[in-house]
């Protein structure tokens, strides 16, 4: 199998590609023909990272930050689980699907060490013996003149519960990929075999259910949230003619936005309905121009803070004009004295812009993603202080008006 290793936002050297490979990769990365060649191209990934296979071609796209940092951020964003780098024990240049598979297998082994989690599930069946409660109405409707079978409802204590279904679905999704590590494939097979009696459920990426945790199932939290991450992100599959492509991809834009939102909400001690990506008024009075800021803080029906989280490849180390214009539109429509743009550190320098004739102050802040999850969350604490300050200013201005 041919292999191509790419890095987020970096342009590669030339590679020969077939038309099918070129067209399929063009859905994921920028493909540019090399002058004076018939079939050679340079490849430039955007914010999408991961790995995919196109026929006999294997392509790996590494993130700018390490994969342990990426997985720590993504797991915190999806379930507020604080994985440390030591929890992701794999070689530095491991492909993302292999890294996820190794992490899932390790988390499953820890969780299953106390035995498979069981729970009660309500079942309704027609049986020849009474179990649980007889559903009289159903019995009369379906079998008015028959004594057997009996329509019953009962609670079954089983391992075929949502938590195990999520883990099994995630393990089989990764196992369907061509993982590079034989040991990782073996560990995933062990996870699937352990869950052999659990139903295989298809979970849509946009509708992966949450599991409620308590003292009885807290030991499952890591493996469940890691499974939800796998199921929610990146299953990629397509076919062009005889060439089939599949892989696992994650959008760093989504990971960063979700992490900043969840981490700030936790630091500020606010519920989902009060802080995050919420519905805001339109820019114009006729409601023709919709606004969708990533971050807003609401006190009842009044917005007291607005901001955006941006994960971009910025070349001149300053916030792009378009981002500043967008933030100005948010602040204007919501009648706020200013707003905040949050970038990954290294993409834009912290700055403050006072807008002429508008009385608006636009602030730019950064979050360093390169350290441990505890270090990143510490920088979120400083960011939360800026959010509180902007909110306090907005409330002062409104009281003075």
Predicted regions mapped to residue ranges:
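Catalytic core segments in nucleotide and nucleic-acid processing enzymes
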Residues: 1-22, 236, 243-401
